[in-house]
Swiss-Prot record:
Activated by calcium ions. Activated by magnesium ions. Activated by manganese ions. Inhibited by the serine hydrolase inhibitor phenylmethanesulfonyl fluoride (PMSF). Inhibited by the chelator ethylenediaminetetraacetic acid (EDTA). Inhibited by iron ions. Inhibited by aluminum ions. Inhibited by rubidium ions. Inhibited by lithium ions. It is an enzyme of class 3 (hydrolase). Catalyzes the hydrolysis of cutin, a polyester that forms the structure of plant cuticle. Shows esterase activity towards p-nitrophenol-linked aliphatic esters (pNP-aliphatic esters). Capable of degrading the plastic poly(ethylene terephthalate) (PET), the most abundant polyester plastic in the world. Can also depolymerize the synthetic polyesters poly(epsilon-caprolactone) (PCL), poly(butylene succinate-co-adipate) (PBSA), poly(butylene succinate) (PBS), and poly(lactic acid) (PLA). The gene is est2. It comes from Thermobifida alba. This is Cutinase est2. Its main location: secreted.
């Protein structure tokens, strides 16, 4: 018959305690390893980005369209809403055309951005001659329309806490104005912007300004660069100047505008740091590049 001595009992107890401690440590380690996955960005949408994916004419999401009738739109001239078909919630962006322009001049950008996981409205303004501050009010009205008056297919896909604006020319000026009035916006992207006001020191919204080297209507010397310089440095901001481009570069499909607009919106509307790699340090400039100049307040 086997007899267990007090010393052996102590040894067995020590082994049991060590085994329990080891098991507990393993559980803690497993939980710690799983924690990053559980704490993943809830706004992250789509696959890991690549340069070729961002340069393509469309992104990973299939897109549907909805017409916003001029007669049903309150405060702006109607437009077209582009949204991902996949059921989920997304940030929402309103885009304004420039002076004398219509939504057709920015339609390519609306559809392209939507294909990367956003709900986008490309608007018509009340008149094609509307000035920048009027366009700011209309961009704001368009955001409200998507949240309250669009179909349920659109409304149910929008995260109302993640809104942004874009615009070309005077629409870009309107974008700056609205960004100065609505600090709750997540991002602003003025495209070859025009505005008589040159100082935007009250903007705290992350802002990407895209200018054009050969713009003779809103020259970068008188518009884009002073706008960028006036935004206070604590604000996340970037300035990208298109090489050899004119004022109307945003009116036709442009891979550089598309790529960096999407990257900016992903980084700041979706808080998706996977896109920081395209903004910091940013694109190559100079010979054989589509970008004449790039500067920013990196790191973001």
């Amino acid at each position: 018959m086997s007899v267990t001595t007090p010393r052996r009992e102590t040894s067995l107890l020590s082994r049991a305690l060590r085994a329990t401690a080891a098991a507990a440590t393993a559980v803690v380690a497993t939980v710690a390893l799983a924690a990053p996955a559980q704490a993943a960005n809830p706004y992250e949408r789509g696959p890991n980005p690549t340069e070729s994916m961002l340069e393509a004419r469309s992104g990973p999401f299939s897109v549907s369209e909805e017409r916003a009738s001029r007669f049903g739109a309150d405060g702006f001239g109607g437009g077209t809403i582009y949204y991902p078909r996949e059921n989920n919630t997304y940030g929402a962006i309103a885009i304004s055309p420039g002076y004398t322009g219509t939504q057709s001049s920015i339609a390519w950008l609306g559809e392209r951005i939507a294909s990367h996981g956003f709900v986008v409205i490309a608007i018509d303004t009340n008149t094609t001659l509307d000035q920048p501050d009027s366009r700011a009010r209309q961009l704001n009205a368009a955001l409200d329309y998507m949240l309250t008056d669009a179909s349920s297919a659109v409304r149910n896909r929008i995260d109302a806490s993640r809104l942004a604006v874009m615009g070309h020319s005077m629409g870009g000026g309107g974008t700056l104005r609205l960004a100065s009035q609505r600090p709750d916006l997540k991002a602003a992207i003025p495209l070859t912007p025009w505005h008589l006001n040159k100082s935007w020191r009250d903007i705290t919204v992350p802002t990407l300004i895209i200018g054009a080297e050969y713009d003779t209507i809103a020259s970068v010397t008188l518009h884009s660069k002073p706008f960028y310089n006036s935004i206070p440095s604590p604000t996340d901001k970037a300035y990208l100047e298109l090489d050899g481009a004119s004022h109307f570069a945003p009116n036709i499909t442009n891979k550089t505008i598309g790529m960096y607009s999407v990257a900016w919106l992903k980084r700041f509307v979706d808080e998706d740091t996977r896109y920081t790699q395209f903004l910091c340090p940013g694109p190559r400039t100079g010979l054989l590049s589509d970008v004449e100049e790039y500067r920013s307040t990196c790191p973001f």
